[in-house]
Amino acid sequence: KVKLVCFPHCSNVVGQENSVARIATMAHDVGAVTCCDGVSYAPHGLPDVGALGTDIYLFSSYKTYGPHQGIMVVRRALADRLVNQAHFFNADVRYKRLTPAGPDHAQIAACAGMADYIDAIYAHHHGGEAAPADRARAVAALQRGHEDRVLAPLLDYLGSRNDARILGSKELGTETGRVPTVALHTAKPAEEIAISLAEHGVICLLYTSPSPRDRSSS
């Protein structure tokens, strides 16, 4: 029997969002717990974790303009079922009981800067009073719109070429569930493309398997 279903909120390869609520419902229907990895989606959507329905949602806050700190949301009913992993005197403290070494107080305090950053953007573009969740949604919409405007020319250009094929959706907009992560299948080797882009001032990080020559010399 399936006990735990783990899945990403969004593909980190083709940039396609998964239906978290639908997956969570399907898993819950058979009595399974769900764990959603949001690291590839969080910077593009600032998700409403409560509305998604998953039991666990986690991501790294450096993806959302914060420190290099892991953030995990666990529904209370599930958190109370999990075995304490911390000191015995923290067994009843939910935000401590799953952290064996104890909270990293400096990193946690630094996470407040993420809210300050979102509030600063909201004040600049909108101003006025609004609830924190409403401010976050408004800023997320601004950021997503900007991402789409930047990505559109690239997708149009790639779509016009016969030596490159976009993997995943070519359509933009929140309704398509597509975030600005682009994967390609190209006629040329990735190394040649990276070198060519570098000559035009485009930063490229190239990750490849060792070549036969490299393997033979090791």
Regions inferred by a protein language model and the residue ranges of each:
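Active-site phosphate-binding strand-loop segment of PLP-dependent enzymes
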Residues: 1-43
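Structural detector of well-ordered beta-strand residues that form the stable sheet scaffold
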Residues: 35-37, 58, 167, 205
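Conserved small-domain helix->loop->beta segment predominantly found in fold-type I
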Residues: 99, 119-186
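Short amphipathic alpha-helices in soluble, non-transmembrane regions
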Residues: 194-199
